[in-house]
Regions:
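P-loop NTPase motor core of the ASCE superfamily
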Residues: 18-21, 63, 269-287, 423-424, ...
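P-loop NTPase motor domains
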Residues: 2-7, 138, 147-149, 156-160, ...
Length: 601
């Protein structure tokens, strides 16, 4: 009597599911024996008790072999994968849970699946595929992957059972990254997760650079099923004054610095002296307008920066004159001025008098920070200032040209424009659902600028919510093709947005796309490191594959090597034969999911 060790080649060969079903060959003899024994018992050739005992034994062995054989066939049937399914909305509602997020159907990947994948890599899988009619044995004739579908089918057949995969809603506070190549299913995944957010009653903002009509229809369908009416829609190229909405990106602010930050978020690249001075310039103009009771908008900022600081400075100092000046203030101020030049206009001379009075006559404790910042620009080199404004004006031109003039800088007094005016605060308070079609295929630069402005606006409002302790409404932000619009505010949302009630999901195609936008792979990895959750679809780029798999860890893969040896010795005149067999089991530490298989999903 002997036993086969667990690690022997014979035991592994018999327990291996990816092989010919030898067990079925033994089923026929066992069942034939059962029939023959039943006949012998019926004819009283064998004692009834003995016949029944032997019949039970043969039937049991036949059933055992049949079960093992069908198990092998089922495992081989699963190698044909699973067909892409279109889920009905009613079925999606069955899986809905407001405390968790459903991400689809599948199985938990364990080391045993890595072992199966490693074993399959040694085989010619095409020889293991079952004919179409045999899939009917397992009710899979209409569920196997179709030939025209992309991906290796056996990757989805490594486990016989699938279940609903869920993650607790709280886990998504740290941000979600969806990565996958073109047509790999990013839009479907975004739609599935976004639909659940709409059903939960979140304030939902979806930024779609491409402007997929299919995605918008899914957006509308989810809102209809949730009873939330038709979603809001913003399109930067919309020339209609009746369709869509106008969105005021400068409506919510605490200081002029926030407005300056939003505008400068459109400028790519790292901070430098130019960006710092340009930011300070925009901030000064915004603060001056706020001090005068005017609401800054992209349009009015562009107009004032183009004209210069003189008009705003004149108005600000005149306010101080009305409040604090004595009757002879003009004579006092002119005493500090040199003789008037011939080419000096009345307007310039008047402003010089006001500046002289403010700087030399008005007591220092009555000076204000806003006027002081305006005076810095006033005394600054005109040549250098013109260079700064010449670089800033193209940015404002992108954000205020054509339809964007009314869309991003709405005028409430314009009776001809019937579109409603929304801002980030009103959108969140009403738990609105906003679809942003950036139309990047038509104009990528405008799309990137508008997307960056909206993200900057949301970041500023998230900071306000955090400061005021407002977390009553959950804000779900979804950004498709994030490499087109990512900026520092979006990075801040990924890093700290949950504190302000913003839960961000971004989708990208490859890591190099993000690196190209941000300027370096290091910057791209820093952004991706802020995403605590990852959903990986089919990835063709090797750098992206490595980024995904390095977070999965490693496991041990077992190999059994068999060595057979024979030896013939006839030097003594008589043949002498010797033989031997050895088995060597090794374990190698490998990636739990090899990187190259991400390109075969």
């Amino acid at each position: 009597m002997f036993t086969i060790r667990e690690d022997t080649a014979i035991r592994r060969r018999r327990s291996h599911p990816y092989r010919r079903s030898h067990e079925l060959a033994a089923v026929v003899p066992w069942f034939a024996s059962s029939a023959y024994l039943a006949f012998l018992g019926y004819q009283n050739i064998l004692p009834l008790n003995l016949s029944f005992a032997l019949l039970s034994l043969t039937l049991g062995m036949g059933a055992y072999r049949l079960s093992n054989g069908l198990h092998i066939l089922r495992a081989r049937s699963l190698l044909s994968g699973r067909r892409m399914e279109l889920m009905k909305f009613s079925r999606a509602l069955e899986d809905f849970d407001d405390k968790s997020v459903c991400i689809g159907y599948g199985f938990t990947w364990l080391p045993e699946h890595t072992q199966k994948l490693h074993d399959l890599s040694r085989l010619n899988i095409s020889t293991l595929m079952l004919p179409s009619f045999m899939h009917r044995l397992f009710n899979r004739h209409d569920k196997t992957q179709l030939p025209e579908e992309i991906g290796m089918p056996y990757l989805h057949g490594l486990d016989a059972s699938e279940k609903t995969l869920r993650r607790a809603l709280k886990n998504f506070e740290g941000g979600l990254l969806i990565v996958g190549t073109t047509q790999a299913g990013k839009g479907v995944m975004l739609n599935f997760i976004m639909t659940q957010a709409i059903l939960r009653g979140d304030a939902v903002i979806f930024i779609d650079p491409k402007g997929s009509d299919r995605m918008y229809k899914a957006f509308c369908r989810a809102c209809e099923k949730a009873g939330r009416g038709k979603p809001l829609r913003f399109h930067p190229g919309n020339r209609s004054k009746t369709d869509g909405i106008r969105f005021d990106v400068t409506a919510v602010f605490s200081t002029g610095a926030q407005i300056a930050t939003r505008v400068m978020s459109v400028v790519p690249g790292e901070d430098n002296v130019f960006k710092q001075f340009a930011w300070s310039c925009i901030k000064t103009f915004a603060d001056a307008m706020i001090e005068l009771g005017e609401k800054p908008s992209l349009k009015t900022l562009s107009q004032n920066i183009n004209k210069g600081i003189e008009d705003l400075l004149r108005t600000l100092i005149l306010q101080a004159v009305k409040q604090h000046a004595q009757s002879d203030w003009r004579e006092q101020a002119e005493s500090f001025l040199p003789a008037r030049r011939e080419n000096c206009t009345d307007a310039i001379h008047e402003l010089n008098v006001l500046v002289a009075w403010y700087e030399n006559v008005l007591p220092a404790y009555l000076h204000t920070m806003v006027v002081g910042e305006c005076l810095k620009i006033f005394h600054h080199s005109k040549e250098h200032y013109s260079k700064i404004t010449a670089t800033l004006m193209p940015i404002f031109a992108m954000l205020t040209s054509g339809p964007l003039e009314e869309s991003l800088s709405p005028d409430p007094s314009d009776a001809s424009d019937k579109r409603p005016i929304w801002d980030m605060e009103s959108l969140v308070k009403c738990k609105g659902v906003l679809y942003v079609n950036l139309d990047s295929l038509s104009d990528n630069m405008i799309a990137s600028a508008v997307g960056s402005m909206l993200l900057s606006d949301l970041t500023a409002y998230a900071g306000k919510r955090y400061n005021l302790g407002l977390n009553d409404v959950r804000i779900s932000l979804y950004v498709d093709e994030a490499s087109n619009v990512i900026n520092q505010p979006l990075i801040e949302l990924l890093n700290k947005g949950a504190e302000g009630g913003v839960y961000t999901t971004i989708a990208i195609q490859t890591v190099p796309d993000l690196a190209h936008r941000l300027g370096s792979v290091h910057a791209a990895r820093m952004v991706l490191g802020n995403c605590n959750n990852l959903i990986a679809l089919r990835c063709k780029d090797r750098e992206t594959q490595d980024f995904v798999t390095e977070t999965f860890g490693k496991t041990y893969i077992h190999n059994v090597d068999t060595t057979l040896s024979t030896h013939a010795d006839t030097h003594l005149g008589m043949p002498s034969f010797k033989g031997g067999a050895s088995h060597k089991r090794t374990a190698v530490r490998e990636e739990i999911i090899p990187s190259e298989y991400l390109g075969k999903l």
